[in-house]
Amino acid sequence: MLRALRGAADLLSTALYKNEMMMSRRYLSTPAPEPAKPSSEETTESTEPATSVEDAGEPMKEKRITQPYSSEALTKLKLDQYPLYVEREWWKTGKRMTFWASWRQLRDVKRREQIQEVGADRMRLKAIKFNTILPQAIRDEAAEKMQKARKYDHPRLILNMCQFTGRQRGKIKPYRLSRHLFRRFADRSALSGVQRAMW
């Protein structure tokens, strides 16, 4: 019984491994070239009414050519020419492999982006709320808008962690480093404008 179970487990693990290998293979895709449009003479000769995809009520989908990730595919799709790289959305948002020291750092980045969106409006609403010259109705409306704001719109929730370690406390703010790394880099002259104290 145990041998049969062990054999089944081996078969299952090899099947899963092959499936993972197939899924891990990366592909490049590009829209298929558009077919050549028929000339005006050919269209007048044909008597059959041509129904387009839009008339049929079905959504029109682009056909994409999928190729394995290789140097030939890069050359064929002209991705090795200027610009030399394709900037992708996941790269813009900072989701690069091993880029953030910890998941807390990525959370901090998201909060910074959120405050960048609403920071100016929040500052104006706060000024209206605490302005004693304005009528009370306007001040109450500003206070209500601030109350209904999203959870992480408050700038005090931004931690500005150390960029190397993700440490939240003991930071040297202009260099965005924790005190331990600041001292280590300063000792070997790896920070611009910092010299080891000598007396």
UniProtKB/Swiss-Prot annotation:
Positions of the UniProt region annotated as Disordered: 28-67
State one Pfam family annotation: Ribosomal_S14
> Has the keyword Mitochondrion been applied to this entry?
yes
InterPro entries given in the database record: Ribosomal_uS14
Give the source's domain of life in one word: Eukaryota
One of the record's GO molecular function terms = structural constituent of ribosome
Give the subcellular location.
Mitochondrion
Which SUPFAM superfamilies does the UniProt entry name for this protein? Glucocorticoid receptor-like (DNA-binding domain)
Q: Name one GO biological process term.
A: translation
What are the UniProt keywords, alphabetically? Answer: Mitochondrion, Ribonucleoprotein, Ribosomal protein
Please give the GO cellular component terms listed in this UniProt entry. Answer: mitochondrial small ribosomal subunit
Q: What is known about its subunit structure?
A: Component of the mitochondrial ribosome small subunit (28S) which comprises a 12S rRNA and about 30 distinct proteins. Interacts with LIAT1.
Family (UniProt): Belongs to the universal ribosomal protein uS14 family.
State the protein's name.
Answer: Small ribosomal subunit protein uS14m
Q: Which organism is it from?
A: Caenorhabditis elegans
